[in-house]
UniProtKB/Swiss-Prot annotation:
Protein name: Gastrin/cholecystokinin type B receptor
Species per Swiss-Prot/TrEMBL record: Mastomys natalensis
Chain ranges passing through the membrane: 58-79, 88-109, 132-150, 171-189, 220-242, 337-358, 377-397
Subcellular location: Cell membrane
Main function: Receptor for gastrin and cholecystokinin. The CCK-B receptors occur throughout the central nervous system where they modulate anxiety, analgesia, arousal, and neuroleptic activity. This receptor mediates its action by association with G proteins that activate a phosphatidylinositol-calcium second messenger system.
Any one GO molecular-function label of the UniProt entry: neuropeptide receptor activity
Residues with glycosylation annotation: N7, N30, N36
Lipidation, S-palmitoyl cysteine type: C411
Single GO biological process annotation from the record: positive regulation of cell population proliferation
Gene transcribed to yield this protein: CCKBR
Protein family membership: Belongs to the G-protein coupled receptor 1 family.
Disulfide-bonded cysteines: C127-C205
Cytoplasmic side: 80-87, 151-170, 243-336, 398-450
Length: 450
């Protein structure tokens, strides 16, 4: 992903498609520059103000970096160890966590350190690698969010068709395809990324495109492929999902009241909570099927369990309607969490996409408007996308919170508590009635009927 780089203390060789800093047509890499905060001459800005801004930037970078590393590592460990969380949706969330971790590890240090040191000291290989890995990470995150939206749409609106292909093996193939496609899409970054001297003992990692037209075409291409088209696809998918869930909840509510009145009139008994019939809701069909987890995500069950579930389907009743409604509510919670993830992702990346496109078509105007604190905030906001997902999971995913607690308990088991010994002048504890009953039952069962 291409980010603007602005440098206050260095003047580039002149304008052009690969020119540096405050000149028109600059196209620079994710702020891993010798940049400070503004294109103004250093003497105009007070030393105290610059030191304060630098301290704030370092603090924010450190917080975002630590939260990204810790949070995404936690997601990877929890989703890897918890068998109950091995759903198709969580497979894509695992890939999303890996891409966010890659963004934090491969890009953040090489963004902050050159800003502190005033020059890029890591060489051409690191320069090209950082540019490439950042683009791959952003592309993988976007494609994973699109895959999650389509998977949720299929699971909720087309459940019968979805169960044919909605397996973890198919999800693994889709995830592999997203990584390969992202890797191919971002090949121009290492090709056109160079380390260029821009002053005495000052090096800068930057993109040097063949012409301004190529740079404009590339910016528009990324804007369409990684922002507008995915945004439209996800908006349509989640809109249809929300409509289906609303109609499903209303349908089950009406069915529940009708079934209860019918059972009361006929003197029937409530049924179980097994799979129910398919019903039509606004063009989307919903079915409650075996193998669906409580969070509304499909899990793979052995074939024997599926066959046994089919053979032992209980009679429909009020309990079945309530179970269907509970499953719909669980799906609604999952979709709400996924919507928050999508909104936060686009909120974090919309400013940098807009800034890159603006700079590609109007370099001087973009630099005048964005130099200083605005571009620093835009850079930090784009990196913050790597640490928001763990927070969303912890606050909105009850099962993920429980899995985190279980993982921590497994890694740090508590020592067994020693029973307090009775004092010499105390009587031994008297067994309770329940203990005596269990003892008598065990004795009788062991000895047999006389």
């Amino acid at each position: 992903m291409e980010l603007l780089k602005l440098n206050s203390s260095v003047q580039g060789p002149g304008p052009g498609s690969g020119s540096s800093l405050c000149h028109p047509g600059v196209s620079l890499l994710n702020s891993s520059s010798a940049g400070n905060l503004s294109c103004e001459p250093p003497r105009i800005r007070g030393t105290g103000t610059r030191e304060l801004e630098l301290a704030i930037r370092i603090t924010l970078y450190a917080v975002i970096f630590l939260m990204s590393i810790g949070g995404n590592m936690l997601i990877i460990v929890v989703l890897g160890l918890s068998r109950r969380l091995r759903t198709v949706t969580n497979a894509f969330l695992l890939s999303l966590a890996v891409s966010d971790l890659l963004l934090a590890v491969a890009c953040m240090p090489f963004t902050l350190l050159p800003n502190l040191m005033g020059t890029f000291i890591f060489g051409t290989v690191i320069c090209k690698a950082v540019s490439y890995l950042m683009g791959v990470s952003v592309s993988v995150s976007t494609l994973n969010l699109v895959a999650i939206a389509l998977e949720r749409y299929s699971a909720i609106c087309r459940p019968l068709q979805a169960r044919v292909w909605q397996t973890r093996s198919h999800a693994a193939r889709v995830i592999l395809a997203t990584w390969l496609l992202s890797g191919l899409l971002m090949v121009p970054y290492p090709v056109y990324t160079v380390v260029q001297p821009v002053g005495p003992r000052v090096l800068q990692c930057m993109h040097r495109w063949p012409s301004a037209r190529v740079r404009q075409t590339w910016s528009v291409l990324l804007l369409m492929l990684l922002f507008f088209i995915p945004g439209v696809v996800m908006a349509v998918a989640y809109g249809l999902i929300s409509r289906e869930l609303y109609l499903g909840l209303r349908f089950d509510g009406d069915n529940d009241s009708d079934t209860q009145s019918r059972v009361r009139n006929q003197g029937g008994l409530p049924g179980g909570t097994a799979p129910g019939p398919v019903h039509q809701n606004g063009g989307c069909r919903h079915v409650t099927v075996a193998g669906e987890d409580n969070d509304g995500c499909y899990v793979q069950l052995p074939r024997s369990r599926l066959e046994m579930t089919t053979l032992t389907t209980p009679t429909p009743g009020p309990g079945l309607a309530s179970a269907n409604q509970a499953k719909l509510l669980a799906k609604k919670r999952v979709v709400r969490m996924l919507l928050v993830i999508v909104l936060l992702f686009f909120l974090c990346w919309l400013p940098i996409y807009s800034a890159n496109t603006w700079c590609a078509f109007d370099g001087p105007g973009a630099h005048r408007a964005l130099s200083g604190a605005p571009i620093s905030f835009i850079h930090l906001l784009s990196y913050a996308s790597a640490c928001v997902n763990p927070l969303v999971y912890c606050f909105m995913h009850r099962r993920f919170r429980q899995a985190c607690l279980d993982t921590c308990a497994r890694c740090c088991p508590r020592p067994p508590r020693a029973r307090p010994r009775p004092l010499p002048d105390e009587d031994p504890p008297t067994p309770s009635i329940a203990s005596l009953s269990r003892l008598s039952y065990t004795t009788i069962s062991t000895l047999g009927p006389g």
